[in-house]
Swiss-Prot record:
Assembly mode: Heptamer of 7 subunits arranged in a ring. Interacts with the chaperonin GroEL.
Organism domain of life: Bacteria
GO molecular function term, any single one: metal ion binding
GO BP terms in the entry: chaperone cofactor-dependent protein refolding
Family: Belongs to the GroES chaperonin family.
Organism name: Streptococcus mitis
GO cellular component terms attached to this protein's record: cytoplasm
The keyword Transcription is assigned to this record: no
Identification of the protein by name: Co-chaperonin GroES
Chief subcellular location: cytoplasm
Described function: Together with the chaperonin GroEL, plays an essential role in assisting protein folding. The GroEL-GroES system forms a nano-cage that allows encapsulation of the non-native substrate proteins and provides a physical environment optimized to promote and accelerate protein folding. GroES binds to the apical surface of the GroEL ring, thereby capping the opening of the GroEL channel.
Gene: groES
C-alpha cells in the first residue's frame, strides 16, 4: 500500500460519467476535472512555528480534482494518482 508524505494524497480515479450532487457535469467541466476517492493521505505539513496542519481530506472521501494534476502510479495491478492537497478542488458530500 502506498503511504504518501507531507500534504500529498493518493487517489483512485473513478472512470465514469461525472456527477456532483446528482448533476451531470458538462463535457467541458469533465475535461478539466475528475472524480476520485481518497485512498491515503500524508501526515500534513508543518507551519513555520512547527505546528502540524493535517490534511482536509481523509481516506474514503470522494473528491473533485484537477484533470491533469498529479502523478500516475501503480501498486500491483491497481492504478492511482498522487496529488498535492492543493490540487483537490472540493469534497463531494453525499
Amino acid at each position: 500500500m502506498l503511504k504518501p508524505l507531507g500534504d500529498r494524497v493518493v487517489l483512485k480515479v473513478e472512470e465514469k460519467e461525472q456527477t456532483v450532487g446528482g448533476f451531470v457535469l458538462a463535457g467541458s467541466a469533465q475535461e478539466k476535472t475528475k472524480t476520485a476517492q481518497v485512498v491515503a493521505t500524508g501526515q500534513g505539513v508543518r507551519t513555520l512555528n512547527g505546528d502540524l496542519v493535517a490534511p482536509s481530506v481523509k481516506a474514503g472521501d470522494r473528491v473533485l480534482v484537477e484533470a491533469h494534476a498529479g502523478l500516475d502510479v501503480k501498486d500491483g495491478d491497481e492504478k492511482y494518482i498522487i496529488v498535492g492537497e492543493a490540487n483537490i478542488l472540493a469534497i463531494i458530500e453525499k
